[in-house]
Structures are given as structure tokens and as C-alpha cells.
Amino acid sequence: SSGPPQPGPMGPMGPRGPPGPPGSSGPQGFTGPPGEPGEPGASGAMGSRGPSGPPGKNGDDGEPGKPGRPGERGAAGPQGARGFSGLDGAKGDAGPAGPKGESGAPGENGVPGVMGARGLPGERGRPGPPGPSGARGNDGNTGPGGPPGPTGPAGPPGFPGGAGVKGETGPAGGRGNEGPQGARGEPGNPGPAGPAGPAGSPGTDGGPGAKGSPGAAGLAGAPGFPGARGPAGAQGAVGAPGPKGNNGDPGASGPKGEPGAKGEPGPAGVQGLSGPSGEEGKRGARGEPGGAGPRGPPGERGAPGARGFPGADGGAGGKGAPGERGATGESGSPGAPGAPGSKGVTGSPGSPGPDGKTGPAGVAGQDGRPGPPGSAGARGQPGVMGFPGPKGPAGESGKPGERGPAGATGPVGAPGKXGDVGAPGPSGVAGPAGEKTGKPGEQGAPGEAGPPGPSGPRGDRGFPGERGAPGLGGPTGARGEPGAAGAPGGLGAPGMQGMPGERGASGLPGAKGERGDAGGKGGDGAPGKDGARGXTGALGVPGPHGAQGEKGEGGAVGVAGPTGPRGAPGERGETGPPGPAGFAGPPGADGQPGAKGETGDSGPKGDAGAPGPGGPVGAAGPQGPAGPTGPKGARGGAGPPGATGFPGPAGRVGPSGPAGAAGPPGPVGPVGKDGARGETGAAGRPGEAGAAGAPGPSGEKGLVGLPGQRGERGFSGLPGPSGEPGKQGPSGPVGERGPPGPSGPPGLSGAPGEAGREGSQGHDGAPGRDGSAGPKGDRGESGMAGPPGPPGAPGAPGAVGPSGKSGDRGETGPAGPAGPSGPAGVRGGPAGAKGDRGEAGEAGDRGHKGHRGFTGMQGLPGPAGAHGERGPAGASGPAGPRGPAGSNGAAGKDGMNGLPGPLGPPGPRGRNGEMGPAGPPGPPGPAGPPGPPGSGFDFVSQPLQEEAPDPFRGGHYRSPDGTQKSPARALLLGGSNDVELRLPLLDLAPMDVGAPDQEFGVEVGPVCFL
């Protein structure tokens, strides 16, 4: 063939020749890409204060303020209309006693008298039946800690503990799963030469240019536009090798030479120093699981978990041995009054006198005999309550009249005045028990406010409230100090290319450029004639990154690299949204015991006991000392598992872990150094524009943007559904004591009892049976902590968590020192065939001890423990609360008349007064919440009963929800005097909608009255 002769196979590599003289400066390169942003500069000085901005828009109306303090007392209103008649006045003072009349027929029992002074002690009664359990006593002092119970089941998951202290470095773990594919690595050392590629098609000859004369080497200027290529000069004679020069500046890349024949593989070079750590690669696919490493040493003991929920009640223990006899209780309350004495002899009735006419009221005369009762007149209108008149003078006592003959039995006279107290009759037999207690009186007025009680126990943690509406913006604050320098901004777009500047001093090496798009392939030029071998050019500038090669098969595991330096802590993240609602915390500790309550009402009257033997009741003995704490009960079963706790706070950043195993080999490295420079070929025609390259890989994730401006306030949402009723709150303080009510009317007289015989003395009764077990006591205070139980078995290993998201790009680390240049490798050919996938490496050595783990989740409750054995008998407890009063003893002797009793309970409510005039309209209230969503209803409005001066607006709603649970949707009544009534009504009097002498009407639609 007429082509140029093919070169023979390449000979072995000769010894390294002496370095040639520095080459001439290469043509000026293109402008490099902009460097990566520099470190943030120091904060500038604080600028002068800017002019005031224009006033902002008016803000939204503020939330309604709290109610103001009560205003001062207003002026007196006009006199109201005449009220209704008042209650009957109090009974006037008693007049002087009249002469003693003849004994009348026994009257009906009078009103029960006030309680007399305490009589002499009665004879001792038989023991009463055991009283009901007393109220719970105050909590005793905390007893000494009991012996440690058995290890309980694991509690519910606690809240995550804080991060523990850094543990010691653990032994190396086994090989982990294959990590995801890393980012492109640094270029590797040149691979062995590939086989020769086919010869390219010859290009068209270019015109030879004229060679310029070499200039003196100046300082490296800023990159200018590329100049035109000069013509080739004549070849000079080869000079003697000069002394070794310093490394010259990198020359421009020469044209691509023809591929040589495939050489023999050279010997492996010496391993270079470790290069600087590359950027963090993207996460590769998940590798196959490695072999299990040896079991590490147990970790440090975890922080104690949160307090578990109380376990289920354990089974009841066996009955304990009977305790010692308790201390003597307080003396019982005095017994009820005895049975009435025997009936006196009936006196002869007096003859009835005639009815006298009502004369003018004179001085009080002598008492006449009682006349027969007149017929009841019609009830008169109640008169106006007059002022009480002055007290009249007492009349003289009349002389006793003569005793008249006994007449026929007249009608029963009015009851006579009480006679003198007779001598005590003999004691009668105990009468039968009276009927059950009377109805309870009406509720008294509230008492005065007692002193505030001690704090109650801490309530359960409430559910978090709904998120409140955003508040109004506050006024602009004063200008703050300049903040620290912000994070570096994102990369700006490159500016237009400037004109070439003057040649500057040699710059520092630039940072690594971004990867360029792959250009289209130009046509191959025609091979030039072999020129004489030129001097070795200076090292070329590193070429741009080649396109990313296909993913190679996983290489063998590399040697672990050194541990990188600890990264700087990240800036504090923005506050996250509120977490989900937590579960109710454990119940708080019991509060201090409350103050002693007021004495309760007396119980119902007990049955009369047989009279016991006499003897005064001894005083109450002193209260015995509190016995020691009883044995600890059996542990209850575990409670249900608690719901998952809140997520714990993020732990602090841990120290860098040991370096991972080496990743798979990176893609094919860039083209190796050029071979000997050939003669300059003729310039080729410009190639046609290549097709557009494939889109480049996604750029790095940008920094988080600043928060947007605050949006305008939205409208209030619809009201949510009613929440579940909250737990009952603690009792409010006792109300202040109300004023005493008016005197009630006297009760009806009781029928006289029959006289009983005196009973004989009874014997002591046998002791009663043991009472049934009392109700379960309230939960005691927590005992002191027992000694720690043995450690539980280690929990099962958790499942492997999902892969985390790729972290943000770390800042560039400092460049490591440059390693020495390796010898130039033989120029490689095209990539060889894909190698087989390597086998999994052997398991690594045992890793160091790992850091302390977080507290584990709370385990499920264990099964209930077995019942404990019956404990020994407890010591005698303190004296129990005072029991109820025993049965009544025999009647004591009549006591003296007692002091007058306290004021009776308030009487029934009087009639309502007439409605006063309407007051002035109140100030407008705060805006109510938005109404419920409308539902279909029809509304009819029509005036009612026009003759009423207060016409009543009526309407009926057809609403299925108008019930006691949702009164807001029921019938609403409103009068023109601004009185609104809301149905369901529980109490509606005619006075609420008009005066007593006015008519009123209400038209009510289909609503539910309860």
C-alpha cells in the first residue's frame, strides 16, 4: 500500500534522560471558569442609621381586651315601682303570764323546742353495731423502704434520654453492607496501555503558518484570547544538554498523537501518598450484607426509662393475723332525748265564751277564756308591711277566778300555755323507732369563704390547645447589632468575558473547575510528516474532566484511609413545627393532706337501745402512736403498654466515625501525558457543530432560602367540633358565708307518745363479727427507691433503619500537600473489558466498643407476677376515726330549759318583685366566635299579643340539634327590653317576660322541653 509505513512494536522503555531545557511559553489559554466562592469576609463596620421608613399600614384590630375593672358606683337610679308584700313580720314579744287556767285537753305536740343543755350522763348502753368505715385519715408518714420487690416487667417506652457522654472507641466492626456508589473520584494513575486503536481518517491539510521567534519568558499574564498560530521555524541543531532547570510552567496540551502499538504492561509503580479526601460521593446502591462480626462488649448502662404506667391490681393477699387492740376512741356524742313522760290527767274543759266584736286596741287587758275557733275567712290581700310599733306597757296580772262547775264536754279548746314542769314520771318502755328522717331542709346560703385549701395533686397533663391565631405584629424594635457573617451565597451567574488585562503576576493555582460538557468530535487531521523530536514540553495544565464512565464492577476492598478531621458543628437549624401531642404524663405526686373538714351533719336517729348499766363515761384516752408500716403488698400486674413517647430532641453531632471501606474504583481517568511532540500539522477546517450534549448531572442542592414574608392574617376558621369533656377540675374554694335567711314557719306538732315502763338493765352483748374488708385505700405516696434490681436481658436488635437522605455538601477541606509527581505512564488505549465482580471480602477485625446507645423504647408489659405469700401480721394501727353514735341510752332526768336555739333555716322564696325599669344599655361586648355553619331552617317572625307593653319577639327554628347538649341551636326568645331567654329553659317565671297583671304569650315551634 502506498500509505506511510506502519511503526514497529514499541521497544522497552529507556532510562530516564536528563531534563531538557525549558520550553517556550505556550499560547495564552482561555479564561478559566470562575473560582468557587471564597470564605465569608469579616463583618463590615456598622453603617450609619438610615432615614426613618414611611409609616406602615394600620394593623388588624387587636384581640378584645380583658374586661376592665368594675366602674365606680353609678348615680342612684329612679325610684322603682312598689314591691310585693314582704314576708310576715317576726313574732312580737310575749306578754306577761296570765293567771293559771284550768287544765285543758292535751294539745297537739308543739314545735320541737330548742335543744336543752346536756343532761347528766345516761346509763351505759349496749355496744352499738359496727359503724360504717370512717373517712380516710390523713396520710401517715412515709414508712421505711420495704425490701426490693422482684424485677418488674419493662416499663413503657420512656422519653428519649439526652445524648450520653462519648464512649471509648470500640473495636472495628465487621464489614458493613456495600455502600452506595460514590461520586466521581480523583483521576487514578494511568492504567496499562490498551490495544492499538484503528487509524483515524486523514483530515484535510491546513495551510502552514509562519513560525514566530520565541520571546523571553515573562511572568505569567492573565489568560488572553488565543493568538494565531505562527509558522514552523527551521530546525536548529541539537544543543548539549543543559543543567537541570526548575520545572517550567505547564505548556498547553499538544495535539493528539497517533496511537502507538500496545506495549507490555509495565511494573507496578510505588504506591503514592494518600491524596486529599475527595468530596462526599452520592449514595450508591445498597450492597449485599457482609458477614456478621463478633459480638461487641455490652454497652454502658442506659439511662433509666420514664416511669411506667401503674400495673394492674394484683390478687388480694391472704387475710392477715388480727392486730392488737386499738386505742380507746373518743367519747360518743350525747344520746337523743328520752321518750316523753306519762300522760297527765285530762282536766275538765271550760265553757266556751261568745265571740266578741273587735274593739279598738286598748291597753292589754286580762286574758279571757279561749273562745271556739271561728271559721276560716277568705284570704285577704297582703297589706303593705308597716313599721313595727312601739312596745306597749305590760298589763297587770289578773286575779285567779273561782272554779266553775264542770260543764258538758265542749269542743277542744285551743292549746293552753305550757304548764310547769312536772316531776319526772317513771321511765317508760322504749317506744318503736320513729318514721324515717324528715325531708332535708332547703339548701342553706353559701358559707363564708374558708381559707384556701392546700394545693391539690397535680392534674393530668392536658391536651395541647389549638394553635392560637397569630398575634399582631409588634412595633419595630431598635436596630440590632450587626449579625455574624452569613453563610456563603449561591454561585452567581458568570459575567461577560472582559477584555484582556495587563499581564499580572503569577497567580496561585486555581480551584478545581466544574466539569464541562463533552464537545463534539472534530474530524481527524491528516498525519503530518515526522518531525525531529522536539524538546520535552513543560507540564500541561490539567485537562477538563472527562465524561462520567459507566459504573465499574466493585473492586476489592481498599485499605482504610485515615480518619478525617472532625467537621465544624453545623449552624443551628430553624425551629421545627411543634411536635405531635404528647401522651399524658404520669400522675403527679399526691398533694399535701388537706385541712380538716368541717363537722358533717348529724346522722339519722338510731334505734333506741336497751338501757345499760349506769356509770359515767370515761374521758377519751390519748391516741396511740402510729404503728410501723405493714409489709409491702404483692406487685400488681403490668399496665397496658404506653403509647409511643415524644420523639426525643436531636442529639449533638457525634464525632466522625472511622473511615468506611474503600469504594469501587472511579471511572476512567483523564488522558495521560502527551508523547513526543510531532511537527505542526496544517490547520484543519473547522468541524461542524457537534450535537448538543446530554444534560449534565444535577447541580448541588442549594442552600435553604430565607423564610418568606409573613402572610396576611387569615380569616378565622369554622369552629371545630366540641371537644370531649375535660376531666373534672379540682374543687373550687368554699364560697363566702351568705347572710342568714329569714325565719321559717313553725313545723306541725307531733302526736303525743305513750308513756313506757322502765326497762330492766341488759347484759353486755357479745362482740360483733369482723366487718367486711373496707374499700381499697387511696394510693399511698411513692416509697423510697429500692436498691437497683439485676440488669434485664438485652433487648432484641432493632431492624435496620432506612437509608438516610444525602447530607448537604460539606465545606471543602484544606488541600493536602501535593505528592511527588509519578513517572509518566505509557499512553493508554481504550478502556479494557469489564472485569468480573470481586468476591466479598473477609470479615474485618472486631471493632472498638461503640458509643452508648439511646434509651430503648419501653417494652410491652410483662405478665402479672405470681401472688406473694401471706405476710406476717402487721403491727397495731393508729386509732381509727370516731365511729357513729351508738344507740340511745335510757332517758336521763329532765334537764333545765336550754338556751334558745340558733336561727332556723331560711323560709321559702318570696314572690318576685315587680320588674324594675330597664337599665341603661351596657357597653358592647367583645365579638363572639363565628357562628356554626348554617343549616336549612325556616324562621317566622310575628309580634305576639300586641296589648302587652313588652311585645315578645317569637320565632321557631326547625333544628334537630336544639337539645340540652347544644343549647346554642335551640329556640331563642327575646323581648324588647333586651332580656334574652334561651331554650331549653329550666326555670321560666311569668315575671321574666312581663308584670304580674299583664298578659303574655309565647309561640313555640317544635322544640324539646326537658
Curated annotation (Swiss-Prot):
| GO cellular component terms attached to this protein's record | collagen trimer; cytoplasm; extracellular matrix; extracellular space
Indicate, by first and last residue, each region the UniProt record lists as having compositional bias (Low complexity): 25-48, 73-82, 213-268, 300-310, 324-343, 405-448, 559-568, 581-596, 643-662, 679-701, 796-805, 872-900
Query: From which residue to which does any coiled coil extend?
Result: none
Q: Name one GO molecular function term.
A: extracellular matrix structural constituent conferring tensile strength
Family per UniProt? Belongs to the fibrillar collagen family.
Compositional bias (Gly residues) = 160-179, 203-212, 311-323, 468-477, 486-495, 519-528, 609-618, 633-642
Bias category Basic and acidic residues: which stretches? 58-72, 834-847
Which GO terms are recorded in the biological process aspect for this UniProt protein? extracellular matrix organization; skeletal system development
Top-level taxon of the source organism = Eukaryota
Q: Give start-end positions of Pro residues composition bias.
A: 1-24, 145-159, 918-933
Give its localization. Answer: Secreted, Extracellular space, Extracellular matrix
Its protein name is Collagen, type I, alpha 1b
| The entry's keywords | Collagen, Extracellular matrix, Secreted
Q: Which Pfam families match?
A: COLFI, Collagen
Tell me what organism the protein belongs to. Epinephelus marginatus
Ranges for region Disordered: 1-969
Query: Where is it mostly found?
Result: secreted
Which PANTHER family did the record assign? COLLAGEN ALPHA, COLLAGEN ALPHA-1(I) CHAIN
Limits of the Fibrillar collagen NC1 domain:
982-1010
